[in-house]
Regions:
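Non-catalytic terminal accessory segments
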Residues: 1-129
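Soluble catalytic domains of enzymes that build or remodel membrane lipids, polysaccharides, and related
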Residues: 134, 139-232
Length: 232
């Protein structure tokens, strides 16, 4: 059954890559060489995702590992949004809302697609920077002499993408809440203990000004449970 699901996943992925690549090829008002360069670079980015997973990144210099991680993982999301965008454009062409010329060797179409994709990812990045604070009031059946203040975090996914500079800001936000206790509900690690060690993430955790209680998440098991426990 697992093999069947793997085959279905790979066929779906290949179909999506083929659909997006074909549309990009048709859309670009470039020479054949130019089309090959652009579509080839896109496909190599997808391949990078799989080579990162198969061969790993921990044996590479940190800057190289970060670059390969960002390239491979970003390509999935860019490809997914391109897939949805081209599906909408194809639907618009079928109902005669979008002229066929918009999708074939078109500077107008190319600039429009680039503008839409840039706008989507800029908005997404700005939303990512805005960390949402959700206040929760928990009632106790037992009498408490005073109120207690806790902060809970989840899915930090620290590593090659969420790096030390970013985590430093999160620590500052947590300390600003002045909690008595900090809870972390798993997935501190994204997938590599080495990425945390090289960036001395432990030093940032030590800046937290309250006791920390954390549990393992699935990414801790993926990165290696014994190593994750030692880091904890």
């Amino acid at each position: 059954m697992n093999i069947i699901w793997i085959i279905v996943f790979l066929l779906t992925l290949l179909s999506g890559c083929g659909y997006v690549s074909w549309h990009v090829w048709q859309l670009l008002p470039l020479t054949v060489a130019g089309k090959w360069i652009v579509t080839g670079a896109m496909l190599l980015s997808i391949v990078c995702l799989f080579t990162n997973f198969i061969f790993g990144l921990d044996d590479k210099p940190m800057r190289v590992a970060v670059t390969l991680y960002e390239l491979g993982n970003s390509s999935v999301f860019i490809g997914l949004y391109l897939l949805m965008l081209f599906l909408v454009l194809d639907l618009g062409r079928m109902v005669h809302l979008i002229p066929r010329s918009f999708l074939y060797n078109s500077w107008t179409g190319t600039v429009s697609v680039v503008a839409v994709m840039t706008g989507l990812f800029v908005c997404g990045y700005l939303n990512y920077l805005h960390k949402v604070r959700v206040p929760l009031v928990l009632e106790s059946s037992r009498h408490l002499c005073r109120q207690h203040r806790l902060v809970m975090l989840s899915d930090l996914h620290l590593g090659y993408h969420n790096r030390a500079d970013e985590f430093r800001k999160w620590v500052d936000k947590v300390n600003a809440e002045q909690p008595e206790l900090i809870l972390v509900a798993g997935d501190i690690i994204d997938g590599s203990i080495r990425a945390l060690a090289d960036q001395n993430m432990a030093a940032e955790f030590r800046r937290l000004k309250a006791p920390v209680y954390a549990c393992l998440g699935n990414h801790e098991y993926l990165s290696g449970e014994p190593q994750a426990k030692r880091f904890y």
